[in-house]
Amino acid sequence: MEKNFALVDLHLHLDGSLSLDSVKELAALQDIEIPDNDKELLEKLQVREGCRDLNEYLEKFDFPCSLMQTPVGINTAVRNLEAELAAQGLIYAEIRFAPQLHLQKGMNQSEVVAAAVKGMGQSTLKSTLILCCMRGKDNHEANLETIRVAKEFLGKGVGAVDLAGAEALFPTADFEDLFVLAKELGIPYTIHAGEADGPESVYKALEFGAKRIGHGVRSLEDGALIQRLAAEGITLELCPTSNLNTSMFESYEVYPLRKLMEAAVKVTVNTDNMTVSNTTVAEELKHLALSKEEMHLMAKNAVEASFTDAETKEWLKEEVEKRFL
């Protein structure tokens, strides 16, 4: 990785990206007992080799979530993550999390987001929050509340909403009303689709009006869908190591990034969960053996698709070009 090259991460989950140091600080701040050796601690945070699927992968989120149930826990986690991303050379990141998963100690969703916003902007990193609705069967009201809270903070730290969780168990088709509301309120959105479920999930996300798709790699199972993604300029938020972790692909060599590029689909390279998958954006780009020109294209695509304001987007575009020269 060339020094000072512009790095961007559009698909980064807060709860899956708490570093070991951050976890220790959060535990100490809140008097929470955690394993006293790093090996045991990492076992609670990182996915094991031989992970079966996305559902097993998602089990790694309960422990870090338990450390972010207070205002100080959340704003410290965001502050630390932004500092770590800046140190890695990122110029911009979109950090996503589900406010409804942080209510165990009395906060409401608005208070959760306010705490996260308080942790932003304390490093050189430019950032935006994406609030995740969660796939499930008993949380419809909580999801609607997430949309309403996103509107409350839109342009004040929050840039968009998302739908995350166990895609194969809770199909995208079941969540249309969330995006009807988001559209009515003028909130941009991305949708996790085409990861654990097939092309039909991506078709539904497009039907709901999504201009960005989280993962989306199973779109390759449907040639007509690939043509549509290219024609409509839909951006895919690819997360290679995460997809290898969940047994979607056997190796980076067969990961379909270039196949998608050859089909004129806009793609970006992201981490998904830095700690769960033990990765960084720089490592993702290295694994894929991208040329300097290809890395430049990934950064340009990411900035163009970002959920930030026009002024920040222009600054990011200039920074990407300046660092490419």
Segments the model singles out, each with a brief description of its role:
Residues Y189-I191:
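Conserved hydrophobic beta-strand within the GNAT/NAT acetyltransferase core sheet
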Residues M1-I187, A196-S201, E207, K211-R212, ...:
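Metal-cofactor-binding active-site regions of metalloenzymes
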